[in-house]
Amino acid sequence: ELRGVAVDDPSRELAAGEHGERCIRGPNVMRGYWNSPAASAAALSADGWFRTGDVARIDEAGYVYIVERCKDMLLCGGFNVYPTIIEEAIYAHPDVAEVCVIGIADAYRGQSPKAFVRLKDGAAPLTLAALQAFLEGRIGRHEMVRALELRAELPKTPVGKLSKLALYEEERQRAAAAAPG
């Protein structure tokens, strides 16, 4: 069995087409984590539904489209914002070679999207205003990038994937260095 639930309220089941956390149940689903009752309780509901940690949507035909990991979702001014959707829109820009979007602290909205971009060789510099103009109409206003950092290279994991974890750590260190005291 497969269903979608609200990320912020797992008791609320979602209709087809809505983004939410995918949950599965059946004889092929584990009963819990070995010797870890706390992790088991967090991942499994009392009636056996396993929370996958994937944000996805199920269409009317039953096809599942995975959008993001729950842990990567941003909460911006009360809206669930999925960095992958923003990244896809930025990749449509003809001068962008690589992009990684993370959430940064925002005193008013909680979090705001920040894009780290590596431009293609020979591309003209890209400004935040130009990127926002490009994204207008491609993503929602609540998803709009609020900060941009151009880089010659983006950090990667040992297997070559872009590393959001490294960018979050850099931002954490930057915020700590800027903090008073």
Q: What role is predicted for each listed range?
A:
Residues 1-23, 42, 60-61, 124-128, ...:
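Conserved beta-loop-beta connector loops within the AMP-binding
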Residues 2, 99, 148-150:
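Generic structural signal for residues in well-ordered beta-strands
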Residues 26-32, 39, 55-143, 152-155, ...:
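AMP-binding/adenylate-forming catalytic core of the ANL superfamily
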Residues 14-16, 32-35:
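Active-site glycine/GP-rich loop and adjacent strand/helix microenvironment
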Residues 42-43, 181:
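Active-site-adjacent loop/helix segments that line or gate small-molecule/cofactor pockets in enzymes
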Residues 169-181:
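Acidic/polar alpha-helix N-cap and adjacent early helical turns
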